[in-house]
């Protein structure tokens, strides 16, 4: 007889249209062919307005939440706020962490004390000067908001603040307006990368406290190249150049984010010349990539992450069954038929370009006969029943789940696809009620810890998988600063997770595409899908 398999979670860790750490897939859309035909062969016009201002217009989905990454981790939130607020340090496309608001810190011999000096006379948009006390306030607020608080868990005093027994972060000591130190509990190699994330942006304490619940809605003040003029759900967000920007003169006059939900309508508006930037959804990529008028305006990049299968081992702990599930998915077919050639079958959970990636590993394969044998060895000679739960907000995920349903039959796995709304999905995943689900995750900073960390903590580990050797390697990896040592440590850690315990197994690596007005130069996008316009211009 068949037995029900509980506890498989398909986790998407690839860049998505809405979230940095959750939610991915295609929006509901009209026919791409109809849209392309309606638009004809028109191309985008220059974004310069009649009075000579240079305003870039960006098509985007509606965040429908406050523009505050400390509370909401949607990627569209950060696409906007990254041009308004800044962190102490920044990141480059190759993973380096140069200065932004502070000079590179002096680090103690034991790698546990970081001494910072802020750059002089950095102004917030309200005219006040950046102070070290604003840095401390911003990091304490991050912990109080809880959403991404664990980024700072290695700072002395974090435990007390997160437990509610302390109101301030004792590990940060402010010496004066421009000098402060951060004390860690133990050496933590990715620390500077963590401080470069959008979650660690620096807010002016006085203005943020005064705004209260309106922070990110009617008020958002930073040190960035652009300041927020307006934000209206259902309409858009407008930004204007900050003339006192510490980074020097900015060519653009502003940014105009237009909230458009339908992916084809977004591209249609681009072809009409009404927007200058638009993401190209995989579902419509074949139509627009073959358009000769758009060929030179289509750009691609590979975000750091991959779609993966994660197993709730608290409910079902046999690695043979987890391996069987991994073998029952035809990744190549998904890449070709669902993602239309915009993705490739992975060899490693840790993406290329990050420490710990192993080039020597083979691709994860589709082998339903081997899956059958493994299920029989595990005590399931007649196969298993598996429920796949998907969030109806992301129809692309529904398509993947449906494809998986057909592919798994050959392995003796009977898949039921369950569709739920966002609220139900979040609750079920948090409480272990998802047998198999599709969501997304990709790195917040270019370090293997950002990829593997969710598998070590209860609050982020939806698989409920734990392995003592894996956890030990993770502790070793963050404690050493030697890159060669870290490479070997994380290779071993991933092998345990994806090739021995099969707690997580990748599905695909995706290439994201976007259309950009050819008159625009200097636009920057890094490997974590963050967009920066401060060096852009319109020719």
Range-by-range predicted roles:
Residues 131-138, 177-181, 224-225, 252-254, ...:
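Alpha-helical secondary-structure segments
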Residues 329-356, 396-405, 426-539:
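Detector for C-terminal structural segments
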Residues 61, 277-368, 392-395, 459-468, ...:
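Local pocket/hinge segments that shape ligand/substrate recognition
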Residues 103-151, 181:
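Aromatic- and charge-enriched surface segment that lines or borders ligand/interaction sites
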Residues 59-109, 221-222, 530:
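N-terminal lobe/hinge region of extracytoplasmic solute-binding protein
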Residues 242-288, 414:
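Ligand-site clamp/hinge motif
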Residues 153-206:
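Surface-exposed binding/hinge segments that line
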Residues 21-33:
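Bacterial lipoprotein signal-peptidase II cleavage site
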